[in-house]
Amino acid sequence: MTKPILLFVLYLLCSCQVQHINQKKDKKMHGKWIEEYTLDTIRYQSIGRYKEGEPVKKWKYYANGKIIKKETYKKEYCKVRFYHPNGALQAKGITKLIEKGKDIHWFYSGQWEYFDTKKDLIITRLYDKGELISEKEIKNTKQ
């Protein structure tokens, strides 16, 4: 009885595919990437995916194990969310990729919303190619 079970487990182990991390294809980052570094005793980690050297899909950023930022890439746009140390949403908005020759830059674009640690909206800002166009402070009516 143990021999068939052992053979089955051996078959499962041999058929499992290993997911490679931090790989390059044609000298460009490709697939799942996990990057870690420490700065001033804070351990930072980012987890996401690259396709042909460009970040794609969802990325998450941590400081000492706590989420500090999430990004969702779709073509030349990226939906960004920043978080307070308590885990509450701090800011959210869109960035847009603009290429000029060899220069590539992500700019804040459209309306961004900023929240306090109690999750109340406190400021909205409107951006165009990274330039602040307008800002509106939200009066807190809660007491």
Predicted segments, located by residue:
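Glycine/tyrosine- and acidic-biased, solvent-exposed loop/turn segments at the edges of beta-strands
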Residues: 15-143
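Bacterial Sec-dependent N-terminal signal peptides
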Residues: 1-23
